[in-house]
């Protein structure tokens, strides 16, 4: 399932809050920082409903929205898509790119080394 950048802002509100949220709550949490109007957020909610990324249930005169798509699943799909598009699905070139272009701290390097050691142990 492909989620646009704007839709991901709405999803982040639902993931962060965890409990079902009203449209008004979502507007209040997302719209000001993005410069959006209420109608924009409602449009994004409708798109997410059609994609079955969220569900809505009636609560009196309003609807409460909750995430169906788990954040971990979304992050995994987006990460895989980026890796496939830019690096042919290979992690090595991604790490090489970041090590060449970004200032990796000693902590970053230690975390990468620890991850590689853990992966190496798991493969044995």
Question: How would you name each of these model-derived features?
Answer:
Residues 8-13, 25:
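Pre-recognition alpha-helix immediately N-terminal to the DNA-recognition helix
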Residues 77-122:
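Amphipathic alpha-helical dimerization/coiled-coil segments
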Residues 52:
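Glycine-centered, phosphate/nucleic-acid-interacting loop/turn motifs that mediate DNA/RNA or nucleotide
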């Amino acid at each position: 399932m492909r989620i646009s950048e704007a839709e991901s802002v709405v999803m982040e509100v639902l993931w962060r809050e965890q409990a079902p949220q009203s449209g008004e709550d979502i507007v209040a949490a997302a719209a000001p920082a993005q410069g959006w109007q209420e109608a924009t957020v409602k449009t994004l909610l409708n798109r997410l409903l059609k994609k079955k990324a969220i569900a809505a249930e009636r609560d009196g005169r309003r609807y409460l929205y909750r995430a169906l798509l788990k954040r971990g699943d979304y992050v995994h799909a987006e990460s895989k898509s980026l890796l496939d598009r830019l690096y042919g699905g290979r992690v090595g070139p991604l790490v090489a790119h970041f090590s060449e272009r970004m200032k990796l701290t000693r902590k970053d390097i230690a975390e990468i080394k620890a991850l590689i050691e853990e992966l190496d142990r798991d493969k044995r």
